[in-house]
Every structure is written in structure tokens, then in C-alpha cells.
């Protein structure tokens, strides 16, 4: 995946793209054989350690912003997650979602990362940002961990943009192979946030049908079938999701950037390649330029084949850079 690949060319000027990470995210120990593992972040870091990414602005994520978390999750839930971390070994909050001694520190820095990303993008310190951190968040509901997720990072980003920076409308596009049931639940009755998702169905967690539209018609789902390729993915975005995001006139766009729809991924059955994620990123950049001064905050979700993840994240970031 090099700069000579015309598939990643965009018409955007060179922009300041911020990448946030923190070494504590490597210490969230999910145990042997768990797909949501520290090697995911190492693979992304290695992919971004290339001369063509020299222009990236990089930042270590700060610690938790509790006020930002409490805009999404109740205090007793936040306290319970913090208290659940064991002194040694692992505890399972559900069959897929273990915590180790250092897990809450990683979770806290994820929150700090999305808050800092929103702050920088909304203040103009960066045009857009990619939060390359774990654990992911889009399965976490208001008060429920699920599917590797504890706090909903994308939801925290959206609410922080509104509360701290005056954004009236936030659009979230989620292209993870799994439906972001937690994000959908959180914003089901919120007319100020549009949640748009492409995902495989049937597949975990089982939500995301076209008839799930929210109380204010601000939930838009475009389910795909196993085996669907990039052409079908792009058509779904062009016909079902992107027009709705454009018509919503968002003040900032949040991306739940899951790369497990890649054809190499062991947890999904779609047939996407990295160029498809680059294309989706470029289309969102066009909408962001039109309505949101180009402001995009992208938050890592899934992606469990290390090569597919690395190639996809690199294509995504290279597109964000306007390269």
C-alpha cells in the first residue's frame, strides 16, 4: 500500500491529521487466543511508521475525562467498570469481554484519546483525527459492556463535541462488520445525532435491520450479506447512508472505524479490501468539507486480521491526510 497506488488519491488539499495512541492500551490483556489483542495496535503503529506518514501529527492520549464519560454512561456503571478490574488474572464481564489488572487504565486513555481528538479538531488544531486505541466501544450501551467493549468511545466523542464545542448535529458512520448496537441504543431517542451503519447480517450482535430507525428517524442501517464485495458496500453507502449524512448537515462527523469487513478478517464474512475503506473515507471527507469545515474524528473499532487491519488503517489514514 504505497503512495504510488492511485486508489488512495483524493482531491483534498494536504491537511493536518492527528493520530492519538497510548502505550497503556497494549496492557489491556484479553488472554491467549482472544481476537481483540494488543498486536492489533502494534500492527497499526508499524503500518504508520513509514515515510509517507511523516506529516502526521502524533499525540499520546491523556487520561480519563470523567465528565465526558458521564454524558453517555451513568456514574454507577462507570464505577462498576472501574471496580471490576481484578488485581491479577482476568474477569469476564460477558463471555467475550475480559478485564485484566490494567484494563481500566487502557479504557481511561481511550476516553482521553477521543476527547482530545474532538478538542483538537473542533478548535482547529487538526483538520481530522484517528484514535488508534483499544478496547473498542460501539457494542457498549448506556449501562452494559458487550462484545469486547466497555465505554462507547464514539458516543463519548459525539456528546463531547456537542457539550464542549457547541456542535448542534453530529453524524456517526459505522462501517464495522458488526452492527454498533450500543451506539444505536444510546442515540435511539436523540434527534441531534445521526447514526448510520453498514454491517453484515445475520451476524453478532443480531441488531441493525433496516426497520430500526429510532424515535426521530435518525438511525439508518444498511445491512449487507455474507460475501458482499466492495461494489455492493459502496452502493449501500451511496444509496442509503451518505445521502442521509449529507442531508443531516452535521457539524462534525465521527467514524466508528472497524476494519473487520476486510476479506481477510476471521470474524466477518464480507469481501472488502482496503481501497473500499479509503473510498468511504474520501466520501465522508467530501460531506465534512461541505457542512463541517472538514472536521472528522475517527475511532478504531474492530479489525482482527493483523495484515488486513494494518493495510486498511493505513489506507484510511492516508486518505484523511489528503495524500
What are these model-derived regions, one by one?
Residues 1-12:
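Intrinsic disorder/low-complexity segments
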Residues 12-323:
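HDAC/HDAC-like amidohydrolase catalytic core signature
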Amino acid at each position: 500500500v504505497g503512495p504510488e497506488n492511485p486508489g488512495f488519491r483524493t482531491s483534498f488539499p494536504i491537511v493536518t491529521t492527528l493520530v492519538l495512541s497510548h502505550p497503556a492500551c497494549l496492557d489491556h490483556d484479553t488472554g491467549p487466543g482472544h481476537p481483540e489483542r494488543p498486536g492489533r495496535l502494534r500492527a497499526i503503529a508499524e503500518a504508520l511508521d513509514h515515510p509517507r506518514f511523516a506529516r502526521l501529527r502524533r499525540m499520546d492520549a491523556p487520561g480519563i475525562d470523567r465528565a465526558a464519560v458521564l454524558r453517555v454512561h451513568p456514574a454507577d456503571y462507570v464505577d462498576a467498570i472501574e471496580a471490576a478490574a481484578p488485581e491479577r488474572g482476568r474477569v469476564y464481564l460477558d463471555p467475550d469481554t475480559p478485564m485484566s489488572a490494567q484494563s481500566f487504565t487502557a479504557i481511561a486513555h481511550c476516553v482521553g484519546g477521543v476527547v482530545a481528538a474532538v478538542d483538537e479538531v473542533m478548535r482547529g488544531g487538526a483538520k481530522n483525527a484517528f484514535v488508534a486505541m483499544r478496547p473498542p466501544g460501539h457494542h457498549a450501551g448506556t449501562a452494559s459492556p458487550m462484545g469486547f467493549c466497555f465505554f462507547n468511545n464514539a458516543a463519548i466523542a459525539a456528546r463531547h463535541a456537542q457539550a464542549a464545542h457547541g456542535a448542534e448535529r453530529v453524524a456517526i458512520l459505522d462501517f464495522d462488520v458488526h452492527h454498533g448496537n450500543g451506539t444505536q441504543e444510546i442515540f435511539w431517542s436523540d434527534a441531534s445525532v445521526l447514526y448510520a451503519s453498514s454491517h453484515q447480517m445475520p451476524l453478532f450482535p443480531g441488531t441493525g435491520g433496516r426497520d430500526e430507525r429510532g424515535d426521530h428517524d435518525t438511525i439508518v442501517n444498511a445491512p449487507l450479506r455474507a460475501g458482499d464485495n466492495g461494489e455492493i458496500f459502496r452502493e449501500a453507502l451511496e444509496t442509503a447512508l451518505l445521502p442521509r449524512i449529507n442531508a443531516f448537515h452535521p457539524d462534525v462527523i465521527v467514524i466508528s472505524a472497524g476494519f473487520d469487513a476486510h476479506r481477510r478478517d476471521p470474524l466477518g464474512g464480507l469481501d472488502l479490501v482496503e481501497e473500499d475503506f479509503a473510498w468511504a473515507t474520501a466520501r465522508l471527507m467530501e460531506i465534512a468539507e461541505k457542512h463541517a469545515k472538514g472536521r472528522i474524528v475517527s475511532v478504531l473499532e474492530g479489525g482482527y486480521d493483523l495484515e488486513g487491519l494494518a493495510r486498511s488503517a493505513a489506507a484510511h489514514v492516508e486518505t484523511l491526510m489528503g495524500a
